[in-house]
Amino acid sequence: MNDNFIERAFSLAEEGVGQVSPRPSVGAVIIKDNKLISEGKTEPQPGNHAEVNAINACNEDITNSTLICTLEPHSYHGVSAPCTEAIIKSGIKKVICPIEDPNPKVSGNGFRQLKLAGIEIERNFSPQHIKRAKNIIEGFKKSLVHKIPFISLKIASSIDGKTSTNSNQSKWITSEKSREHGRLLRSKYDAVMTGINTIESDNPQLTFRDKNGNNTGYPRYKIVLDSNGKINEKAKIFDSNETTIIFTTKKNKINFKKNNLEIIEVEKVDGRTNLIEIMKIINNLGIHKILVE
């Protein structure tokens, strides 16, 4: 199989990371006579899965073609009908896929259904491809198995471990290229999280802007930990349309209202918001990957 086809499937899946949770992001391409004849990627709920989009987008005879997808096709009726049904009906003869879906409702059953229908399954991928496929769904799997989001911490520090000068007057200790990468990271997470001290000192917007400076709408959620309800209603975090979630404690009310603002009160533990409770709440909201800044 041409590695370019596999690369295209992975690229499609990676494009959707941070945009389709609580679904896992999947990429799919359809090959016939060594030519790519269609492709698709996962849509946010209630849209289609990648495999169905690839089948629907195909304008050529799909019979006896090969489907490459980055995650096992799902095999049960949920928000969407099973992808396995669409694949079987389409006339696709072979499915190439690196990993099983960790969802217990699937977990190999998708492959079994396809095999029973006479469709050949190939899973002969390199360790690098398998690792890449698993990385794409790391948030989905973390949520599924541990019931909490996958969390990454972004921190800028000097070689001796400092993040600013003693006076806190320093603005940047990173290069423009590094800051650009940090902004790009935001687009690959469902939410960016920070504390009230960062809001007060830096007054960030916590958005991802394109090369022209336009807001992209990602990440879809901005989360602030504000134990004492100190956030200013004029903070820049409220300047864009993404949903902002503020976690505060039940004794500290935030009295103002804004569009796309959700205030969630939790119990206080050791004088702060209860992080364990917060992570469970966030996971239940369908937020599977968080970038902490």
What are these regions (language model features)?
Residues 54, 74, 83:
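Short cysteine clusters
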Residues 21-26, 63-66:
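Acidic, glycine-enriched active-site microenvironments
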Residues 51, 72, 293:
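Acidic-residue sensor for enzyme active/binding pockets
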Residues 1-20, 33-36, 43, 77-293:
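Zinc-dependent deaminase
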Residues 66-76:
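Active-site cofactor/substrate anionic-group-binding motifs, chiefly glycine-
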Residues 28-31:
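A short, well-structured edge-of-sheet supersecondary motif
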Residues 48-68:
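Flexible, acidic active-site loops/lids enriched in D/E/S/T/G that coordinate Mg2+ and/or position polar
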